[in-house]
Amino acid sequence: MPFFYQLAIPAPKAAEGSYNKGEASRGQALFAGRGNAPPATCHPLYIEPGSSLHTPEEIGIDDFRSSRSPTKQYRTTPLRGLWSHQKGGFYHDGRFQTLDEVVEHYDQHLKLGLVEQEKKDLVEFLKSL
């Protein structure tokens, strides 16, 4: 069960000064708010304690990669340590190169109506994890 062993390893913390603390704080409140809509429902503890699978329709993307999976679904990836991703690969299938693109996707797919500052706050929060 190497998966559970991996969950026991703490994610590295974001370096001091690598994100804006004020914006990250507002982003955290926003992430947990807005009716607890995704991504908060996909990532309630910022990590996924077990297996959480989502259909392409749930997360607003095509089934190109999930169609090759036995379950035909995407796995929720941990959010902690996102700041360490240097080459993109964000989202359930790794399709986005930046966190800005992920936030924009959620804003459009879920019709959240985020203003630019809220988007920036969410990105800073994700960078802080």
Residue ranges of model-derived segments:
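Periplasmic c-type cytochrome electron-transfer domains
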Residues: M1-L129
